[in-house]
Amino acid sequence: MVLALAGPKAKAVRTRQLFISAGAWDDEGLRHRPWQEVDTSLGEDAGVLTVDGSALLKQGQASVGVKRPDCGEVGTRAHGQAGVSVGDASRQGSPWLERRRSLPPEWVEDEAYAERRRRGGVPPPVTVKTKPRLGWERLQAVPRAGTLRARWVAGDEACGRDPTRLDPIACLGLWYCAEVPHDTQGWRQRPATAVPAWGGRGRQPTRARVVAGAPTPQTVGRVAESWPAEDWSRHRIKEGSKGPIVADGAALRVIARREGWPGPEVWLVRRRPLVTGERKTSRWNAPADTPGATLGRLSGRRWPIETCCEDGKQSLGMGDEAGRGWRGWQHPMTLWMLAHFLLVRGCLR
């Protein structure tokens, strides 16, 4: 594109690279500007936001945040830069909304990396943030901006493993659906709790405990095994590369287990695709009167964010930029996100 606009000028490509990798322009403000257009073109009253982490292949040791994570681009562990994305999972299209680099702990805490941070232009203050925490922070900008209609937030098991990370989503007035490990525990019915009687010696107890003889919590896998066949229904959950993917699903209200204690009442949704048979379980804070058909339909709305990343790599050259610094990652990512939205909107015409 540069050669087409500027001709075979010796400095044209280099100038373009410097503008993208080192230019002092506001990438965050530019990323947020199309959100109103996203809502106008693709928005829904009960929109779904998705959060996901991925890594891009990156060689060398000098690039900011480079490590050997599980790099999805090559399907193995390789030098790469990890990031967290937020997307809009509309039924008409799924554009990117936000993406931020995730710094490994050693890049933040190890003094040996201080000079690398300085050379890479990493902005202070620098703190260690897990991918779920970083994703939730970027997610909060969407409802606060007030330009996108959204009701749901979908996340993978990395998000659902720690329920305390889900609470801020509920505080934003959003309903979450996050996959959870199979060993996640809960109660079919809320167990009775009481403050133990004081025996007259030692410190007097003040905190309630689950009373003796109350039902013990069960893993979500064990709970799902007890569901009768009539509780399962079939849903079309997403579009695959070879056609629609259909899965059987069932939903049940359970009492979540929080640090050993009975927590809030939530939906437990079990999904079983017909082709693979791989079982997935997710936790939802949706109201108790939410129709099962809605839960089944939305259970497949997490994957579009993964499609965004694949589209970026295969169609837009995401990951081919040679920049090493902080801006050299943020700026190209911003342009890829804008280009991806134009690609999604163009497919509607």
What are these regions (language model features)?
Residues 55, 159, 208-213, 290-323:
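Short amphipathic alpha-helical "interface-anchor" segments enriched in bulky aromatics
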Residues 7, 23, 286, 299-302, ...:
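Generic structural signal for hydrophobic core residues of well-folded globular domains
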Residues 9, 79, 159-162, 169, ...:
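Active-site-proximal structural scaffolding
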Residues 286, 299-303, 325-329, 333:
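A short glycine-/small-residue-rich loop at the edge of a beta-strand within enzyme catalytic domains
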Residues 311, 316-349:
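Basic, amphipathic alpha-helical segments enriched in Lys/Arg and hydrophobic/aromatic residues
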Residues 92-120, 124, 128, 181, ...:
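An anionic, glycine-rich sequence signature occurring as long contiguous blocks
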Residues 84-85, 283, 337-339:
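Conserved, well-structured core segments
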Residues 1-154, 158-178, 182-185, 199-214:
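Conserved, well-structured functional cores that handle cations and Mg-NTP chemistry
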